[in-house]
Amino acid sequence: MAKEKITGAEAMMRSLEYQGVKTLFGYPGGSIMPTFDALYHHRNTLNHILVRHEQGAAHAAQGFARVSGEVGVCLVTSGPGATNTITGIADAMIDSTPIVVIAGQVGASFLGTDAFQEVDLVGITQPITKWSYQIRRAEDVAWAVARAFYIAKSGRPGPVVLDFAKNAQVEMVDYEPMKLDFIRSYDPEPNPDKESLQEAAELINNAQRPLVLVGQGVELGNAQDELRAFIEKADMPCGCTLLGLSAIPTSHPLNKGMLGMHGNLGPNVKTNECDVLIAVGMRFDDRVTGKLDTYAKQAKVIHLDIDHSEIDKNVKVDVPVLGNCKYTLAMLTQLIRKNEHSEWIDSFTEYEKTEYEHVISKEIHPVDGALNMGEVVRAVSEASNNEAVLVTDVGQNQMMAARYFKYSKNRSIVTSGGLGTMGFGLPAAIGATFGRPDRTVCVFMGDGGLQMNIQELGTIMEQKAPVKIILLNNNYLGNVRQWQAMFFGHRYSFTPMLNPDYMKIAEAYEIPARRVMKCEELQAAIHEMLTTDGPFLLEACVIEEGNVLPMTPPGGSVNQMLLEC
């Protein structure tokens, strides 16, 4: 392809298009104006979504990436514009979400002079990105963009930052598009060791009580089919991490539910009873393991992961299997024998019955006509035929949504797992509607988290984004209040919330809305929400002091889950 002399800003636009980008989220400002001017001429091919705060741009890019499997992109200015994306970048790093953040920067000759809106973005973001690079010359644009996208989406995905100096945006360059599929000294997908695969297969073939822990890595590796073939051949039950919940349908008979502090009783307790523990694309987060000194000490541990740094980081591994789990699972499935573990699988039933009797039935079948959080979640899930994309904020709403929503399709849960970012939900849901416009997107929020990025209702209004917002309003910072009730003597220190009238707020943003306060109002309201074209806000006034159970107490083991407060 012949080279053409264009500006660095124009080269950026063409490079994004060459990478397949069609949607980006951003907010203009001084140091990025030449690039936004170039974007003006590409507005028919690059759909720019104007957010109301740069944090919203980063979270929207995350939501887009999580549901689509593509790289999310955001475009912001220097200084506060760039620093406003930091929380989203950190969130993407810990949750392995591929995004590219392009931020304006002062001209190269002004660097280090404390110029207006100058910050050392590369220095700030190096610990929370896979790669952070400052583009000082227009001739580096095509290479930097190609490298950024390759790094963001290869291996264990994650965020990349491009700090785009203003002089590089206006300089002329002989442009030639570029793609990369190799970087020397960067090995994103290690090849699995055949000896390790054989050792893992031998352990699985001889196991009497195997348990598979399913993480987000299964979805990131597009290994859902391989996972099902693996567990079905050896008849092995599994539990899913928060981010791995939609890697296998909720209805699958070998899926025993969610792992973690507020997960299901069976898979948590059985972690300390299994004889072989097979972790697939998960990182043994502290919310999953509980007290490490007592975690799965009786079991041989097999860990399948693409990232060697996760091996032995939290839990001692007997057999590590490095590589993309799409391939390692397929290889391992060929090596294991067809088996059956009916007695072991049946032993989960007593825990399922106990949890249903003490927790679930009370949550989804209230006796006094008041609304419970889990009841609302289950009703929305069923009304959407369990096919909607679930987005959550952080807090009780997150755990209730994760527990009571059901999943039938992959890439169906978008939530802030590792960082636990309140305010994530609303902008992430906006991104999800652009990433998968063919699917219904439902976001569950608390009254605390909604107000953290409530300005993005303006983005929803402008774009007519069909986000279905379910506000679980309990007039508390509910998760903190629950801890205060259980462990701090019911001293509710600054957790009660005085809330605005959300119906009036929705009206101001031209978003149809409805408030429900009783069980008998719920079904009609959900039907109205799901059949309304465009966005909708459903405010469910739930009981104020509801608690998320079961719960592993702080410092406790996974087999010490509390069923009541």
Residue map of PLM features:
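Conserved short loop/turn motifs at secondary-structure junctions
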Residues: G215-E219, H365, G446
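Short acidic/His/Gly/Ser-rich catalytic and metal-binding motifs that mark active-site loops
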Residues: T35, E171-D174, A247-T250, E355-E357, ...
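Active-site nucleophile and cofactor-binding loops and adjacent substrate-binding regions
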Residues: Y27-G29, H48-H59, C74-G81, R136-R137, ...
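N-terminal alpha/beta PP-like core and its mobile active-site loop of ThDP/TPP-dependent enzymes
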Residues: A2-E343, A383-N386, P466-I469, F494, ...
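Phosphate/pyrophosphate-binding active-site segments
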Residues: A2-K3, E139, E202, Q298-V394, ...
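Generic enzyme active-site microenvironment
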Residues: V161, H303, V391, F444-M445
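Thiamine diphosphate
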Residues: I102, F116-Q117, N268, D312-N314, ...
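Active-site diphosphate/adenylate-binding microenvironment
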Residues: A9-K22, G30, T35-Y40, E352-A432, ...
